[in-house]
Design a protein with these regions (language model features):
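Short aromatic/hydrophobic "clamp" motif used to bind/position activated sugar donors
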Residues: 91
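Conserved donor NDP-sugar-binding/catalytic core segment of glycosyltransferases
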Residues: 103-129
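Short beta-strand/loop segment that forms part of the nucleotide-sugar
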Residues: 37-47, 66-71
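Glycine-rich, basic loop-to-helix element that forms the pyrophosphate-binding segment
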Residues: 70-86, 107
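Cell-envelope/extracellular polymer assembly enzymes that use nucleotide-activated donors
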Residues: 7-10, 39
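Short, acidic, metal-binding catalytic loop of nucleotide-sugar glycosyltransferases
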Residues: 27-37
Length: 129
């Protein structure tokens, strides 16, 4: 697969009370070693901290970040709302407190392409709390 054939990817995140980790999570997504298009869709639940303000600020400075309201705060509802707002066929689900490696999306897309898979998953390891 060369850069000209890389599919565009919608990264979706159901978000609730992620004030501490959200900026680092989004930064890791934006620094991906992936030359295809990437958009980030944050499904914002009714957070009791500064999550919504942080997300709004991040979206102001990068047009690839889109916000959608998730009034219930439920993960499944947030995922569905984010998928409905997504522009691309390939969906990558990330948790708002995660920091993915720089090759995460590239590796996932390569595996999907090579295996003809429509869904892949993997283990996540905690570096801290």
């Amino acid at each position: 697969m060369n850069d000209l054939t890389l599919p565009s990817v919608s990264v979706i995140l159901p978000i609730l009370n992620e004030e501490r980790d959200l900026s680092n999570c989004i930064s890791a997504i934006l620094q991906q070693e992936y030359s295809g298009n990437i958009e980030i869709i944050l499904a914002l639940g009714p957070s009791k901290d500064r999550t919504t303000e942080i997300a709004t600020e991040l979206a102001k400075f990068d047009s690839r970040i889109k916000l959608v309201s998730n009034p219930s705060g439920q993960t499944a509802a947030g995922l569905n709302l984010a998928i409905a707002k997504s522009s691309y066929e390939v969906i990558c689900r990330i948790d708002g407190h995660s920091e993915i490696s720089r090759s995460y999306i590239k590796t996932a897309v390569e595996i999907m392409s090579k295996q003809g898979a429509v869904n892949i998953g993997g283990l996540m390891y905690a570096d801290s709390e």
